[in-house]
Amino acid sequence: MVMLDILSNALIQIKNAEVMGKRQVTIWPVNKLTYYTLRVLQRYGYVGEIEYVDDGRGGKYIVQLLGKINDIGPIRPRYPVKYREIVQWEQKFLPARQIGILVISTSQGVVSHIEAKEKKIGGVLLAYVY
């Protein structure tokens, strides 16, 4: 099976595990973009501990779920966004102000839309979570 979008696969695995009420999920295959996205989710309290397991086939992450995710998903296609346009994308993907985050890949790394607005930087939209 050819995996075209590893990040989308990881987010859907998290969503399915949350719906089923699981306490942890194993994400495989992985890449650096997936790891940095998980770190943003961890920083905002949507997931717990992230553990990397090297299985000799590219590795996998075991992510502890906290039951705080109502919806999570990739943003496809990955739209480029300027920092002045972030509010418009918030209104499109998030249910209300101050609820949820957009994950953005910027020149300064993968950050949330809140951090991108504070730093006044744009980037590419990767995912949403609330």
Swiss-Prot record:
One of the record's GO molecular function terms: structural constituent of ribosome
Matching SUPFAM superfamilies: Ribosomal protein S8 (SSF56047)
Record carries keyword Electron transport: no
GO biological-process terms attached to the record: translation
A Pfam family assignment: Ribosomal_S8
Keywords: Ribonucleoprotein, Ribosomal protein, RNA-binding, rRNA-binding
Tagged with keyword RNA-binding: yes
UniProt-listed PROSITE patterns: RIBOSOMAL_S8
A GO CC term attached to the entry: ribonucleoprotein complex
Family statement drawn from the similarity comment of this UniProt entry: Belongs to the universal ribosomal protein uS8 family.
Annotated function: One of the primary rRNA binding proteins, it binds directly to 16S rRNA central domain where it helps coordinate assembly of the platform of the 30S subunit.
Assembly with partners or alone: Part of the 30S ribosomal subunit.
Name used for this protein in its record: Small ribosomal subunit protein uS8
Organism, as annotated: Pyrobaculum arsenaticum (strain DSM 13514 / JCM 11321 / PZ6)
